[in-house]
Amino acid sequence: MSKRTFQPNNRRRAKKHGFRLRMRTRAGRAILAARRGKGRTELSA
């Protein structure tokens, strides 16, 4: 039997998909801008 692939971890989640990571790159800021434009209540993990 293989194990489940999703092993939740808040720290890993924030490091990979967090707000500060998004702000670091131009592409990341574009993602945030798109999500703001769409009206998302949550912008990032």
From Swiss-Prot:
GO-annotated molecular function: structural constituent of ribosome
GO biological process, one term: translation
Gene Ontology CC entries for this record: ribonucleoprotein complex; ribosome
Pfam family, one: Ribosomal_L34
InterPro entries cross-referenced by the UniProt entry: Ribosomal_bL34, Ribosomal_bL34_CS
Key word Ribosomal protein present: yes
Record's keyword terms, sorted: Ribonucleoprotein, Ribosomal protein
Family (UniProt): Belongs to the bacterial ribosomal protein bL34 family.
Name of this protein: Large ribosomal subunit protein bL34
Species annotation: Arthrobacter sp. (strain FB24)
